[in-house]
Amino acid sequence: MSNIEEFLRQYPQETQRVLGINAEQLEKLTKIAKEKYQERKKQKTRLIKAGGGREAKLMLEEQIILTLFYLHNFPTFQILGIQFGVSESTAHKIFHEWLELLEELLPASLMEQLK
């Protein structure tokens, strides 16, 4: 668990300041995004047998928080990686994977507000 996620669990009232959306919105978004992610994953053409490959370092919820944190605060990917305990390139990859999906789920006004 990242320091940011731990902080948000401890102080949910600070979610708006840290991510640009409140804790209730984050919970709803996470639920919907996870479902959408699983749908996409099923449709994706697999190159490696199911169960193969390396496990992700961050859970899906942490990946969503990483993306929202970047959109709201604009740290470098190096700093983002340090905060979430992943490499700079992994932080970059996670951000771009989730950005596309979140753009579909969030209203344009909220995406602009986050940026």
Question: How would you name each of these model-derived features?
Answer:
Residues 1-115:
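Short alpha-helical elements
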